């Protein structure tokens, strides 16, 4: 079978989707898949996922409403960074709006995608160096998470047909 090697380095909600979507899609196609979670991506291996999204500093992020009349939902709400940085709770609002929009569109949650990956035998490899730097222990993560260093991932990735850094 083909082999996919992914590196997941970010733990925000918007960056949590790509490795799990690609991993589960490749797994469903019968590919071998390994995802190496390093730096902030390592938090995606925790039992309770708390990934949030911040539109601050992300001008490409559309702010659309997941409710209301269709015309209202289709408005691109341009929010200046100054407003987003100074309004308490704005990150929480953006996170909830994104989750609701994904739900309305039938997109699986991060938890569901991670579970699908596990069901298909996708290897979820946590970076040992990142664990050491941030003070994590193996018991901080889901039991299915493998722990390995860069060499562990490179050995896997060397034989991969597709390698992506996300």
Identify the function of each model-found stretch.
Residues 6-16, 45:
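Short, glycine-rich nucleotide/cofactor-binding loops
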Residues 5-10, 93-102, 136-139:
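Short, basic, glycine/proline-bearing loop/turn elements
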Residues 126, 139-166:
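Glycine-rich, aromatic-bearing surface loops/beta-hairpins
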Residues 33-39, 125-128:
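Short internal beta-strands
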Residues 53-93, 106:
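A glycine-rich helix N-cap at a beta->alpha junction
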Residues 84-122:
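Alpha-helix-centered segments that form part of catalytic cores
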Residues 16-30, 35:
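Histidine-anchored nucleotide/phosphate-binding helix
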Residues 41-55:
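N-terminal beta-loop-helix "entrance" segment that forms/cooperates
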């Amino acid at each position: 079978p083909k082999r996919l090697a992914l590196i997941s380095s970010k733990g925000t909600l918007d960056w949590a989707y790509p490795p799990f979507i690609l991993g589960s899609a490749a797994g469903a196609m019968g590919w071998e898949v390994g995802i190496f979670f390093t730096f902030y991506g390592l938090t995606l291996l925790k039992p309770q996922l708390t990934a949030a999204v911040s539109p601050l500093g992300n001008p490409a992020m559309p702010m659309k409403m997941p409710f209301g009349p269709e015309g209202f939902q289709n408005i691109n709400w341009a929010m200046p960074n100054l407003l987003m940085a100074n309004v308490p709770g704005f990150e929480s609002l953006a996170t909830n709006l994104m989750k609701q929009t994904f739900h309305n569109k039938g997109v699986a949650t991060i938890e569901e995608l991670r579970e699908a990956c596990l069901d298909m035998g996708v290897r979820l490899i946590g970076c040992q160096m990142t664990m050491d730097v941030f003070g994590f222990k193996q018991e901080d993560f889901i039991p299915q998470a493998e722990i390995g260093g860069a060499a562990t991932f490179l050995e896997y990735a060397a034989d991969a047909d597709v390698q992506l850094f996300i």
